[in-house]
């Protein structure tokens, strides 16, 4: 079994999403010590954002004349590792109502027509990445959940749910550490501990 572990927070060891994603990965390792973990830190080793050339190579085998280009290799490997993974664990902080741009750059490498989804003759979309389990370790400073005053501003989790639904993922687990900065951060430790416990119970 292969597990792809992705972190996207720029905050290093002080990142809530990193703590929760690490707890989830530790639990999967505990349940199956033979699991092969591939780690991708999009903060310390970011993928470049798409340009015209990178777009033209999405989902294609690199030819010898470009096979030495690090940015193209990184994009090809991102898609390869995602397709090979049985489980994907992603640490996702909220930045300015949405996801980090580093994570968006990764998504742009794995959402590839003909590889992870296809357009049907009737104008619909069929996901081709079925059968994977995805765990989202979501961290937010404020309260953006359903029923909260700021719910309409939330474009983090709702966006990711759409992304993974489009490519055929139906086994999606969300672990939220929300409200980390409310009350001056007084509840941060408790909120983070609760989220880590949920991750450890996967």
From Swiss-Prot:
The keyword Repeat does not apply. Binds 1 FMN per subunit. Its EC number is 1.6.5.-, 1.7.1.17. Transmembrane segments: none annotated. It holds the Pfam family Flavodoxin_2. It comes from the Bacteria. One of its GO terms (molecular function) is FMN binding. FMN binds at residues 9, 15-17, 94-97. Its cofactor is FMN. Belongs to the azoreductase type 1 family. PANTHER family: FMN-DEPENDENT NADH-AZOREDUCTASE 1 (PTHR43741), FMN-DEPENDENT NADH:QUINONE OXIDOREDUCTASE (PTHR43741:SF4). Homodimer. This is FMN-dependent NADH:quinone oxidoreductase.
């Amino acid at each position: 079994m292969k597990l792809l572990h992705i972190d996207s927070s720029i905050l290093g060891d002080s990142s809530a999403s990193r703590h929760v994603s690490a707890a989830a990965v530790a639990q999967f390792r505990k349940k199956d010590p033979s699991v092969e973990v591939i780690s991708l830190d999009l903060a310390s080793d970011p993928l470049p954002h798409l340009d015209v050339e990178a777009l033209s190579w999405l989902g294609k085998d690199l030819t010898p004349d470009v096979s030495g280009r690090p940015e193209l290799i990184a994009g090809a490997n991102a898609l390869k590792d995602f397709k090979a993974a049985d489980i994907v664990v992603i640490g996702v902080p909220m930045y300015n109502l949405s996801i980090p741009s580093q994570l968006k750059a990764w998504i742009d490498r794995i959402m590839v027509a003909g590889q992870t989804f296809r357009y049907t003759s009737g104008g619909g979309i069929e996901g081709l990445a079925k059968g994977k389990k995805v765990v989202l370790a979501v961290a937010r400073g404020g309260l953006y959940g359903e029923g909260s005053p700021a719910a309409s501003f939330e474009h983090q989790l709702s966006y990711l749910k759409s992304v993974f639904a489009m490519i055929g993922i139906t086994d999606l687990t969300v672990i939220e550490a929300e409200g980390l900065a409310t009350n001056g951060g007084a509840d941060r430790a408790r909120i983070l501990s609760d989220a880590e416990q949920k991750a450890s119970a996967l």
